[in-house]
Amino acid sequence: MGSLYELTREELAASLTGEPRFRVEQLWRGLWREDRRVDEVTTLPTALRERLALEHPSSLTAINEVVSDGGATTKWVFALHDGATIETVLMAYEDRVTVCVSSQAGCAMGCSFCATGQAGFTRQLSVGEVIEQVVVAARAGAPRRLSNVVFMGMGEPLANYDVTVGVLRRLHEERRMSARHLTVSTVGVAPAIERLAREGLPLTLAVSLHSANDEVRNDLAPINRRYDLARLAAACSRWIKETGRRLSFEWALIDGVNDTERALDELAAYARPLAAHVNLIPLNPTPGYLVRGSTPERVRAFRDGLIARGVNATVRNTRGRSIDAACGQLASVTRGKPGLRRDGSTTTVALRTRPL
């Protein structure tokens, strides 16, 4: 049988046939409100806990856990029941605690600068496999409360649409997380954006844009050959109209590719009619894409240029680069030894070993 997090409340009740009805609420509270492992739900009899743990083992087995940024960023590599692997990242800020979850093992989108896309697609994740990433992160972040969940890990969330929406609804309804603190990132699956707009969830949508020029974007994000910038803009406009929510564009700044004055003008012209906020991300290094990221000076100049052109823009505070946990770096492999960079130089990374 699968993880308990695969089950709805009704399915959970069915698994407790023969038990008093109040056991369902005790178990549900332990799992969804208190983030406990089933063996830790001490309101249940020991024999029942042992049976449930045996029948519904965890979906995730941690095979590596590394910490950076002075303990503020944690990355896990998890093995799934069939040997597929995924990565999850927990980031603690002064004002929030965020987990970045994977929605697929690998990714079929093939974005040239993304380590996940370079690695290829393995399979879709299930609802329970995604939710357990959230629960593991919530336990690790305690006593601080997990406040935000972002679908910015491995995979294209809207290519695993039903699971993504199922997870969003359960986080909102069962964990009582504000939908505004749930973010879905997409490379631009236009029909799915329009479908998501009709779900009635006032979540945050982040579009990985990276170029407002079809020719350039075709190379950076091959999905653009199927849904070009005009089609994507129409979907974004529908999103805004249906939800009343602002959207954001993610833009990984690549030296000489999308940090030029022309790229600046193209982005401003594209973002302004949609009143989109632009998150600028200095390109993070990956083994399969050897072009450099923009210099800090160019990043600041690009941001200032957008603001001068009437576009809201900020530079993302990059976390986890030293442990390959930053945007575009997730590839579900343990590269080198913990505590070392790929080139052998030391970094402030420490292994943790604690039960999940």
Cite the ranges covered by each PLM segment.
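Conserved alpha-helical substructure of the radical SAM core
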Residues: Q118-N148
